[in-house]
Amino acid sequence: MSGDPTVLVIGGGATGTGVARDLALRGVDVTLVDRGGLAGGTSGRSHGLLHSGARYAEDDPRGAEECLRENRTLREIAGTCLRETDGLFVRLAGDDPDYFEEKLGACEEVGIETERFDADEAQAVVPGLSDDVAEAFRVPDGVIYPSRLVAANAADAERHGATVHTDAPVEAVETADGAVSAVRVGGDVDAALRPDHVVNATGAWADRIADLAGVEVGMAPSRGVMISVEYDGLAPVLNRCRDPDDGDIVVPHEGEAVLGTTSVPVDDPDEYETADWEVERSIEECAAMLPAVAEAPEVRRWWGVRPLYAPDETGPNRRGISRGFTVIDHADEGVGNLHTVVGGKLTTYREMAEVTADRVCERLGVDAACDTATEPLPGADDPDRLDEFVDRYGGTNPTDAGVVSAAADDD
């Protein structure tokens, strides 16, 4: 390739493509590279929940507020990258009623709209809900199709002048005089790029890029399993209303239900063991809320790795680590043109990208406002067009394979 970009974004998940889109809309010359297809890491291997913030309301109100803001924004700009479903937090007979009240009160304090149901009302909302249900409350959860969301961000970035390269792994980072001087990119690029600024948006792999640049990022990744089973007719997301534990969420995916998940620390987000107990426990626990999933035919299973940022780890299974995000300025470590963005959730990718782009533009002296909260994604209301974008950038991923690939097969 010819020419060096002003900004090089490393990482083609939701956050990386969000940063590329944001910068491109501000008129910045940006190139994005990813070692594989887009959304192939954490973004496309999640359970696909559009968070209302309720899962974190009592323990992490900052993270909950971020989720709620972006939940509302994405409903305005992302169209059929999402599915509006609502969610229920379900207390079963053996679950702590005080925790239910604490969760409900925390949601209301954060500003999350809720509606309380007794057992009969909850079973009317969700046919097949366990007879052990004691009470529930509704929140504005939803479903994200990450392959579409990420591809639409990349397509809009390119429409505004960005360059996007898949199958382009970073092989080396050179520094000189207090800055990244060159980034060696392999694969289809096969060149040394010399950007003015670099954004490390590689999620659970952020410490690897940081290591290449001679700086530190304290990642504490954890793996979790998802099992998709055949299940028609589930309308809302189901969340078990108890202290966070394995198997506490069921996400509807158009004829399927995604059951999850576990939280097991891993040292290497590429090479880690998986265990049958994770699958068995997730199914058993989810079936406590929705019994029919215990015998439902399995469609697929996959593991994903959470990109948790924790210089000081919290808890043996890392469930206590904040789901808020952090933008790290590596100027403090002697590399003045490198930012890393870590943590956060798929739901908050756009805000993460905006804050990162603000920092980069400030460093570059670019005076341009962010438009991504109000500018709809291309093809937002046209699923066929969105799926064309998905094909362009590497195809579907496990989270939404049953939706995106099915739509493509119907063409």
Show where each model-derived region lies.
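Dinucleotide-binding Rossmann-like beta1-alpha1 core, especially the glycine-rich loop
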Residues: H47-V126, V133, D245, P383-A406
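C-terminal catalytic lobe of FAD-dependent flavoproteins
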Residues: R242, H253-E254, D270-W277, R281, ...
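N-terminal Rossmann-like FAD-binding beta1-loop-alpha1 element of flavoenzymes
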Residues: P5-L32
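Flavin (FAD/FMN) cofactor-binding and adjacent substrate-gating region
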Residues: V90-A155, R159-H160, H165, V173-A179, ...
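Central beta-strand plus flanking loop segment that forms part of the substrate or channel wall
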Residues: L50, G214-V237, C286-A287, W303-P307, ...
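Glycine-rich FAD pyrophosphate-binding loop
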Residues: A24-S46
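Conserved Rossmann-like nucleotide-cofactor binding loop
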Residues: T15, L38, W205
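Flavin-dependent oxidoreductases
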Residues: T175-A179, V185-V258, V266-E273, V293, ...
